[in-house]
């Protein structure tokens, strides 16, 4: 009799553990095909920070490799990325749903910093090289968002876990209030961003605070392998510290 009770107790524990594992799996954000992630529509800017982010939105010139894709949708589903097979542009020449640039801004050491981030399904300078997923970003440092004509003080595009720093940027890399950024690899190195004199394309801007809770949670918790989400809660301020150009 005691043995039967013991077996029942073990079965109950196993069932509880399995139930908890299933619940945890159900709570994890889902991963979908990279070309099925729908971007957030660009909202009308309302706040001071949103208007400044829209005013200084950069343009991206893709020299080689993938075009930027949405990384997450409003339900918190993230793109699964691509293997490094095929050419650097294979399977990632642009999303049929449209693209996205992600923004987040704050005061940092008395300078207003606006981080703009792009997601790419793979970072592959050549077939078999590189890795699944890529995140790149540029930080635009301005004087004050709450004045009629803020000044661009510096620009710091991301490059191989570090930054190029321009304080101030050259006039020929700025189109009005828009920094011109290029995305390029120098074989055999992976892709990076830098400023350029070439005009680029704009993507719909969504700010961190404008996204759904599900989307922010996904970007805070989902692993993108060798790439990390620059504007999430764990990376945003440390990257501003590292990119400080003054």
UniProtKB/Swiss-Prot annotation:
It comes from the Eukaryota. Keywords: Secreted, Signal, Virulence. Pfam families: NPP1 (PF05630). Coiled coil: none annotated. Residues 1-19 form the signal peptide. A motif (Conserved undecapeptide motif I) lies at residues 113-123. Induction: Expression reached the highest levels at 3 days after inoculation of pepper leaves, followed by a gradual decline. GO terms for cellular component: extracellular region. It is found in: Secreted. A motif (Hepta-peptide GHRHDWE motif II) lies at residues 130-136. Belongs to the Necrosis inducing protein (NPP1) family. Key residues/motif important for the effector activities are degenerated in most NLPs, including the nlp24 peptide consisting of the conserved region I (11-aa immunogenic part) and conserved region II (the heptapeptide GHRHDWE motif) that is important for phytotoxic activity. Secreted effector that contributes strongly to virulence during infection by P.capsici. Causes large necrotic areas in both host C.annuum and non-host N.benthamiana. This is NLP effector protein 2. It comes from Phytophthora capsici. The lineage of its organism: Eukaryota, Sar, Stramenopiles, Oomycota, Peronosporales.
